From Swiss-Prot:
Enzyme Commission number(s): 2.7.1.33
Active site, renumbered: D109 (proton acceptor)
Positions that bind ATP: D6, I7, G8, N9, T10, N11, T12, V13, T132
PANTHER family: TYPE III PANTOTHENATE KINASE
Positions annotated to bind substrate: Y100, G107, A108, D109, R110, T185
Organism listed in the record: Syntrophobacter fumaroxidans (strain DSM 10017 / MPOB)
CDD domains: ASKHA_NBD_PanK-III
Any GO CC annotation of this UniProt entry: cytoplasm
Gene transcribed to yield this protein: coaX
Family label: Belongs to the type III pantothenate kinase family.
Subunit structure: Homodimer.
Name assigned to this protein: Type III pantothenate kinase
Keyword annotations: ATP-binding, Coenzyme A biosynthesis, Cytoplasm, Kinase, Metal-binding, Nucleotide-binding, Potassium, Transferase
Principal location class: cytoplasm
Pathway involvement of the protein, from the record: Cofactor biosynthesis; coenzyme A biosynthesis; CoA from (R)-pantothenate: step 1/5
Length: 258
């Protein structure tokens, strides 16, 4: 089986594929100081809890936007799986031209999302990823990565409110607000985040559409995608597994033929 690993600034998402089918996924916190053996213990425990074995893994592909973590993860793969993983980065075949001033600056996760979106929709698409940062990426109808937008993520904004104010509490769980007019502090912050980010998303998508001048499919992914999409009429689809699917596609384009 293929183990796909998406290492983000806040969380690391793992997906186990049997051919093209995602059979299980896990989400763990990204920790810069985690050792090789700590990764081994954690991932073996996750596998054991769901009836999988380290020996089941025949290949690994990794997308990582946290360079200090990558070396430990590579060594973990060699020690516990006896596998040299494929790392998404320069020199990897994505099948997608990247039109960016410096293509090396584009986060691996953004390219992986773009590859998955074009492979699935085959049309001009905007991918909105609600991660540590909220990103908007435009893929042309020819399957070209054309650039995008980076804005502060939802949790970054919440942490800023908590650390930069004296009386506002930390809020980590969000729900669809019953009303924009809230009656207590927590509800007020919840409404501000949900409706504020829905407005941000609609505003950026509208500006991108006006500038691009073509009809676009909009797909959202990331931890809070479904919640924000419920308040944003411009998002067409939500795919929680878009990044993992993109990693599988890129693996197929780079695996060695027997």
């Amino acid at each position: 089986m293929l183990l796909a690993m998406d290492i983000g600034n806040t969380n690391t998402v793992l997906g186990l594929f049997n051919e093209q089918r995602l059979v299980h996924d896990w989400r763990i916190r990204t920790e810069v100081n985690t050792t090789v053996d700590e990764y081994g213990i954690a991932i073996r425990s996750l596998f054991d809890a769901h009836g999988f074995f380290v020996a089941d893994v025949g290949s690994v592909i990794i997308s990582c936007v946290v360079p200090p973590v990558l070396n430990s993860i590579e060594r973990f793969c060699r020690k516990y799986f006896n596998i040299q993983p494929i790392i998404v980065g320069p020199g990897i075949r994505t099948g997608m031209p990247i039109f960016y001033d410096n293509p090396k600056e584009v986060g691996a996760d953004r390219i992986v999302n773009a590859v998955a979106a074009y492979d699935y929709y085959r049309c001009a698409t905007i991918v909105v990823d609600f991660g540590t940062a909220t990103t908007f990426d435009y893929i042309s109808d020819k399957g070209e990565y054309m650039g995008g937008v980076i804005s502060p993520g939802i949790m970054i904004s919440c942490e800023a409110l908590f650390f930069k104010t004296s009386k506002l509490p930390r809020v980590e769980i969000f729900a669809r607000p019953p009303s924009v007019l809230a009656k207590n502090t927590i509800a007020s912050m919840n409404a501000g985040i949900v409706y504020g980010y829905a407005g941000l998303v609609e505003g950026i998508i509208t500006r991108m559409r006006n500038e691009i001048g073509t009809n676009l499919k909009v797909v959202a992914t990331g931890g809070l995608a479904a919640l924000i999409a419920s308040e944003c009429s411009l998002i067409d689809d939500v795919d929680d597994y878009l990044t993992l699917k993109g990693l599988r596609i890129i693996f197929e384009r780079n695996k060695k033929n027997p």
